[in-house]
Swiss-Prot record:
This is Asparagine--tRNA ligase. One of its GO terms (biological process) is asparaginyl-tRNA aminoacylation. Gene3D superfamilies: Bira Bifunctional Protein, Domain 2 (3.30.930.10), Nucleic acid-binding proteins (2.40.50.140). One of its GO terms (molecular function) is catalytic activity, acting on a protein. Its main location: cytoplasm. Homodimer. Its EC number is 6.1.1.22. The keyword Aminoacyl-tRNA synthetase applies. Keywords: Aminoacyl-tRNA synthetase, ATP-binding, Cytoplasm, Ligase, Nucleotide-binding, Protein biosynthesis. GO terms for cellular component: cytoplasm. The gene is asnS. It comes from the Bacteria.
Length: 430
């Protein structure tokens, strides 16, 4: 019977066949140990010469790294094994031999591994990170479906930039100009006026010339929008959502976290509510900590975010940023017209901002005035202005960056490892 490695517990004591790749191999005299990988997990196969005969043992000893094969044997429970089960091998059938596999068990440099990203994905570490990424995506759908959100797919090709920035990828759309989307937010606002609570999940593109461990050129975002929600309502959704994601990974990816050496004691503290401080309070706190390179009105850099987050064990919301450094669609605070009703969620342990969100302006005249301040072409945004013309309501939304969230929860230092094929400033291959 053919099974997959993750089904091993159901077949203890039975002879089965597994299609797999040879991740690694070692031998000791008359015993060979095969580390097998099939995409669902890892398992050790034990080949004993006295039990399989000279020819089969010679075949097993000659196997090369990443050779594909069918392995037949009996599944045994083994508490000493890191995978919980192993196979007493009785037969090996080679499907396709692998010659001179470039990623050997020795240490390799980052550039070499990135050049061979299509093969690096096969490693134990990358397998663990991708499993955690998958769990965060799965849990996101579960959370928003349970909360009554409708999944909406905004376009990737757009005729305008949602935040009025210049960090856009330009392309021709027949005889017109088009851009790769930086965010689906404006379209999600339109959907919220139709369906109340909506969310999207898809790729976004930023032509930023940034070379930090937190930045990708192409990354994925979860973007919810909620009609009739004020800022505080949105913050409660955000903290419940992030706490839900962390618990899902703790519940369903414990083996992967262990494989990555993640200290889960930090993650076990991620229970809502999360602390909140204003931008002004954050600036004051930074000055108390000795930062003299930032004044009120400046945006935070990575060292500033890390210093603020270090004061808390959970993610922290920084609210009410200066109006001048935030996008046009954020409304002023009624009590202070120099700041807007917004918040960024800063993850602990130096991982920085993972969520940005705000209330949205729903008054037509206010929105038009803000667009003038930003020198935006109102004709290009006429459809968006229609939302304020025809029965708009107070509404809020946010965007969560998937790769930064995966990096934080998995304890991965650089976001390039949190997406299967990263697009970086100087990397478009493979």
């Amino acid at each position: 019977m053919k099974i997959t490695i993750n089904q091993a517990s159901e077949f203890v004591g039975k002879e089965v066949t597994i299609g797999a790749w040879l991740a690694n191999k070692r031998s000791s005299g008359k015993i060979a140990f095969l580390q097998l990988r099939d995409g669902t997990g890892f398992m050790q196969g034990v080949v004993v010469k006295a039990e399989v005969g000279d020819d089969m043992f010679a075949t097993a000893k000659a196997l090369t790294q990443e050779t594909s094969l069918f392995v037949t044997g009996t599944i045994n429970e083994d508490t000493r094994s890191p995978f919980g089960y192993e196979m007493a091998v009785s037969g090996v059938e080679v499907i396709s031999e692998s010659h001179d596999y470039p990623i050997t068990p020795k240490e390799h440099g980052t550039e070499f591994l990135m050049d061979h990203r299509h093969l690096w994905l096969r490693s134990n570490r990358q397998h663990a990170i991708m499993k955690i990424r998958n769990e965060i995506i799965r849990a996101s759908y579960e959370f928003f479906n349970k909360e009554g959100f409708l999944k909406i797919d905004p376009p990737i090709l757009t005729g305008s930039a949602p935040e009025g920035t210049t960090e856009l990828f330009h392309t021709k759309y027949f005889d017109e100009d088009a851009f790769l989307s930086q965010s689906g937010q404006l379209y999600m606002e339109a959907a919220a006026m139709a369906f109340g609570k909506v969310f999207s999940f898809g790729p976004t593109f930023r032509a930023e010339k940034s070379k930090t461990r937190r930045h990708l050129i192409e990354f994925w975002m979860i973007e919810p929008e909620m009609a009739f929600y004020k800022l505080e309502d949105s913050l409660q959704v955000q903290e419940n959502y992030v706490a839900f994601l962390v618990k899902a990974v703790l519940d369903n990816c414990r083996l992967e976290l262990d494989r990555l050496g993640r200290d889960v004691s930090h993650l076990e503290k991620m229970v809502a509510p999360f602390p909140r401080i204003t931008y002004t309070e954050a600036i004051e706190r930074l000055h108390e900590l000795g930062f003299d390179d930032i004044v009120w009105g400046d945006d935070f850099g990575a060292p500033h975010e890390t210093a603020i987050a270090d004061s808390f064990e959970k993610p922290v919301f920084i609210t009410h940023y200066p109006k001048a450094i935030k996008p046009f669609y954020m409304p002023e605070d009624p009590e202070n017209d120099q700041v807007v009703l917004c918040a960024d969620m800063i993850a602990p342990e130096g991982y920085g901002e993972i969520i940005g969100g705000s209330e949205r302006i729903h008054d037509l005249e206010t929105l038009q005035a803000r667009m003038e301040d930003f020198d935006l072409d109102q004709e290009a945004y006429s459809w968006y202005l229609d939302l304020a013309r025809y029965g708009s309501v107070p509404h809020s939304g946010f965007g969560l960056g998937l790769e930064r969230t995966v990096a934080w929860i998995s304890g991965t230092e650089h976001v390039r490892e949190t997406i299967p094929f990263p697009r970086l400033l100087n990397r478009l291959y493979p």
